[in-house]
């Protein structure tokens, strides 16, 4: 049964996870990408997203994406860079 969104009476996912077009919670592009119903910016951060910090202490890259790679945590990193 759907966990969130229209098919679940508008319920939101826990821990800021995205609600997919099919009503399931997750954090990958399948949930947060096209058709996402709510909390679709889970992987987004930084100045273009109201200064939002990443979940789980991930780094915020210069392009506003959350992750743990050197591309996220080094040159131009916006927050939680160490």
Curated annotation (Swiss-Prot):
Residues that hold a carbohydrate according to the record: 20, 22, 24, 31, 43, 61, 63, 65, 72
Chitin-binding type-1 domain: residues covered: 1-42, 43-82
UniProt-listed GO biological process terms: positive regulation of cell division; positive regulation of mitotic nuclear division
SMART domains: ChtBD1 (SM00270)
Function summary: N-acetyl-D-glucosamine binding lectin. Shows no hemagglutinating activity towards rabbit erythrocytes and weak activity towards trypsin-treated erythrocytes. Has mitogenic activity towards human peripheral blood lymphocytes (HPBL).
Assembly notes: Monomer.
Protein name, as recorded: Lectin-D2
Organism: Phytolacca americana
């Amino acid at each position: 049964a759907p966990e969130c969104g229209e098919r679940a009476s508008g319920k939101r996912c826990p821990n800021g996870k995205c609600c997919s077009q099919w009503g399931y919670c997750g954090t990958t592009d399948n949930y947060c990408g096209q058709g996402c119903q709510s909390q679709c910016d889970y992987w987004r951060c930084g100045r273009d997203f109201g200064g939002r910090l990443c979940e789980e202490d991930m780094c915020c890259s210069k392009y506003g994406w959350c992750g743990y790679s050197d591309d996220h945590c080094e040159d131009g990193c916006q927050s939680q860079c160490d």
